[in-house]
C-alpha cells in the first residue's frame, strides 16, 4: 500500500511506478471516452492525440518497471 500522499518522498520505486502507471491508465481511459463523445472534429482529434500520449507514457513506465522487477 502506498504511503500517504504527503509522504511521497518515502515511496519505494515500486510504489512510484505503480502510481504513475495507474494515473496514466486513468487519463488514457478518460481521453478515449472524451474522444468518443466529442462532436467537434478538432476536439476529438485533440483527445485522440492526448490518449496517444498517455499510451506512450504507459509503455515507457512499463519499460522502467522491468529493471526494478515491478510487474504491471
State where each predicted segment sits.
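Non-heme di-metal
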Residues: 1-72
Amino acid at each position: 500500500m502506498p504511503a500517504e500522499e504527503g509522504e511521497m518522498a518515502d515511496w519505494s520505486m515500486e510504489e512510484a511506478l505503480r502510481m504513475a502507471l495507474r494515473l496514466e491508465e486513468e487519463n488514457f481511459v478518460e481521453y478515449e471516452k472524451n474522444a468518443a463523445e466529442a462532436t467537434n472534429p478538432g476536439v476529438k482529434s485533440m483527445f485522440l492525440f492526448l490518449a496517444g500520449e498517455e499510451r506512450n507514457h504507459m509503455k515507457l513506465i512499463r519499460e522502467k518497471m522491468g529493471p526494478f522487477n515491478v510487474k504491471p
